[in-house]
Amino acid sequence: MTYAEIAHEAQGKMGPCHACPVCDGRACTNHIPGPGAKGTGNVSTRNYEAWCTFRLNMDTLHASFVPDLTTEFLGRTLSLPVMVGPVGDVQRHYGTAFDDVTYNECVLTAAASAGTVAFTGDGLRPEVVEGAASLIGRLGGAGIPTIKPWAADVVRQKLDLVRAADPVAIAMDVDAAGLPFLKDQDPPAGFKSVKELASIISDCDQPFIVKGVMSASGAEKAVKAGAAAVVVSNHGGRVLDGVPSTAEVLPDVVDAVGDDVAVLVDGGIRSGTDVFRALALGADAVLLARPFVVAAYGNGQQGVRDLISVLSDELADVMGMCGAASIDDIDEDMLTW
C-alpha cells in the first residue's frame, strides 16, 4: 500500500481538504478554515520541498541485516521513530466525520496498537481534553496530550486533567499564539515568557515538551524553562508566513540543546525517506499530522495503522540501502546536500 492509496480512500469523505495523493500544500495553499497555511500559504509547501533537497548516500556494501526501527523516547520504547502529531478543530478544518473527541480516540488507539504514540489536540470544549486524558490512562499512558498556551488558570485546569493519566509526556504548542482563529476566543491563546513557561512546567510530574521551536535561541529558552524535549515546528505554516522550513533550522536546534534534551521535528514529512532525512540531521523522532488526518478520515483506525506500516516499510528500506542497521546508526554522513 502507498500513501496515495490511503488518500484515495479519504477522497469524498473530507471537507476543505482534498486528500491529495501527495500532501505538499499546493492545493490547499492558504485556505483556512481548511488545512492551508497563513498569508501566502507557501510555508507548508516549502516544508515539504526542503526535505527533498537532501540526497541519500546509498551504500550496499555491508553484511545483510534486518533494520531495527525501535527507538527510546522519554523512557518508552517505540516501534519506530514516528508519532502522530496533534490536530485540533478537525470538524471545522477537515469535515464532519470526526470531531476532536472522536479523532483523538482514533489516533490514540491506532498508534498505541502499532507500538507508538499520538499527540492529542486541544479544544475549547472541556470534553476534548477530558476524553483524551481518560483514554490515555486506559492505554497505560500511551499518548501525549497537547495544551494550547491559554491563560495560566485555564492551562492549570487542563494540566490537572491530563496529569492523572500519567502520559508519556505533556506538550504545549507555544506557537499556537499565532493561530488567527484562537486570538478572538475566550480565553484567548497567547504568548508565554520563559518565566511563565517554567512555572507551568514545574507543576508537571511528567516530562514536558515544547512544540513550536524554530530557532536556536528559542530552543535554549525552552531548555531554560525545563523542557525535556522540543519540537521543531512552524505549525505547518499556519501561524506565521515567511518563516524557514523546519528542515532548515533543525540542525541549529539540535546543536543548541545538546544531548540531554530530545529533539522532534514535523512539517512536510511525508515518507519514510523523509523520516530518515530528519534523523540524519539530528532529530530523535518525527511527527506527522495532516497525513494521519487523511488516513483516519479514509479508513479510521485501520487507515492510521496502514500509514504507520507504510512509513515503517519505507524507512526500513532506506536504512538497508544506506547501511544503517539501527536508528542510532543514522547520521548526516548518509546525506548529501
Describe every region a protein language model picked out.
Residues 1-29, 237-262, 270, 274-337:
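Conserved active-site-proximal phosphate/metal-binding subdomains
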Residues 2-79, 330:
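An N-cap/entry alpha-helix motif that binds or orients negatively charged groups
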Residues 41-129:
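N-terminal functional module of multi-domain proteins
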Residues 51-58, 111, 163-166, 204, ...:
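Structural signal for hydrophobic packing residues in well-ordered secondary-structure cores
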Residues 94, 119-121, 144-150, 183-188:
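Flexible, glycine/proline-enriched loop segments at strand-loop-helix junctions
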Residues 109, 137-138, 150-265, 272-295:
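Alpha/beta enzyme core
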Residues 117-122, 144-146, 231-232, 286-288:
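Short hydrophobic alpha-helical runs that function as membrane-insertion/retention elements
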Residues 128-154:
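Long, hydrophobic, well-ordered secondary-structure blocks that form the structural core
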